[in-house]
Amino acid sequence: MKKLLIGASLAALSLVSLAEPVSYTIEPSHTFVTYEIQHFGTSTNRGRFDKKEGSVQVDRAAKTGRVEIKFELPSVNTGVAMMDKHLQSPDFFDSAKFPTATFVGEQFVFDGDKVKSVTGNLTLHGKTNPVTLTATNYNCYENPMLKRQVCGGDFDAVIDRTQWGIDYGLAYGFPKNVHLVIQVEAVHQ
């Protein structure tokens, strides 16, 4: 009887541990925060933020999670130094005054074990607004080099930059909508 109780207790404990959130740290070399915006209707301007960090907690059994991704606005990289400097100015990001942007998502939608979307708040340019990032790809796998589980995917949203007080160029015909893409891979801790 005693062995049966010990076995049942261990089984119950293992089920509890399966239902707890699993923590991941974002892998910066496999994570990219990028944006795309139309340029006078002729082409698409693209940029990325080279410095970023963050963490993810996921409880697949409870279908819950939390993600926090912080990116440094002075690290904007369009491939054109003059444009990078202008984007850091008060016309756009005002990165001297607002050096970081942060997305914190706490509403996860799952389809089975796969994350389909994450809703949270994006703080940018001193303002916070809700954003839903939709997964276009999501997977978890056992990384053969790290010997740990890695989860990640591609998430995107179209945001109205004027909600964050970034309205430079509207009078010239620049659109207010920006395609935000967050490609993330995170390593189990």
Predicted features and spans:
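Sec-dependent N-terminal signal peptides
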Residues: 6-11
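N-terminal signal peptide c-region/cleavage motif recognized by signal peptidases
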Residues: 14-17
